[in-house]
Design a protein with these regions (language model features):
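Noncatalytic alpha-helical scaffold of FAD-dependent oxidoreductases
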Residues: 1-177
């Protein structure tokens, strides 16, 4: 209850946990929560000769040598196929604010990212930069924009919009509460 798996993959209805682990995906909230490898307790894998390796451990504290199951994270199935996984869930934050911002300045976008990471590090979950369509550069159109999608999650209501307005002419996409 009130827990979630923080690796948010865009085509989540089209992928599997084993496939995600074998490619060590990051997802839409990697900025805050890291890659899928950071949210695994253990794995069960099947090698090409049919040998089953069980790295599932019920103990939270496990300081016994290297975590051999980590070899399978990002190996894209080269070492074996992942058949079971024990995943870490984390507490869900109460409030989620999402903003869409347009700017013509990539430098300003990067400065905003640095500002938000310094000020709201524990709450900044996503910062996506969508680059302009390349054809807009070819035809010298002045309407090209960098689109930023920013997501901030918190357990208290914050006035993030005010902070963002310091940097941009904010166009609010949606605020979820």
């Amino acid at each position: 209850k009130n827990l979630f798996f923080p690796v948010n993959i865009a085509p989540s209805d089209k992928c599997t946990i084993g496939g995600n682990i074998s490619t060590n995906v990051g997802g839409l909230q990697t900025l805050r929560y890291g890659n899928i490898e950071d949210h695994i307790n253990g794995l069960e894998v099947v090698l090409s000769d049919g040998t089953i390796l069980n790295f599932l451990n019920k103990l939270k504290k496990d300081n016994f040598g290297p975590k051999l199951w980590k070899l399978f994270c990002g190996s894209e199935g080269v070492f074996g196929i992942i058949t079971r996984a024990s995943l870490k869930l984390i507490p869900k934050k109460k409030y989620n604010s999402t903003y869409l911002i347009q700017t013509n300045s990539l430098n300003k976008s990067i400065r905003l990212l640095k500002f938000l990471r310094n000020k709201y590090f524990d709450n900044l979950t996503s910062f996506e930069i969508i680059f302009p369509i390349p054809s807009s550069y070819l035809f010298n159109e002045s309407t090209h924009h960098f689109n930023l999608i920013i997501e901030i999650q918190s357990n208290v209501i914050g006035n993030y919009k005010k902070e963002l307005k310091k940097y941009f002419n904010l166009k609010e996409f949606k605020i979820y509460k």
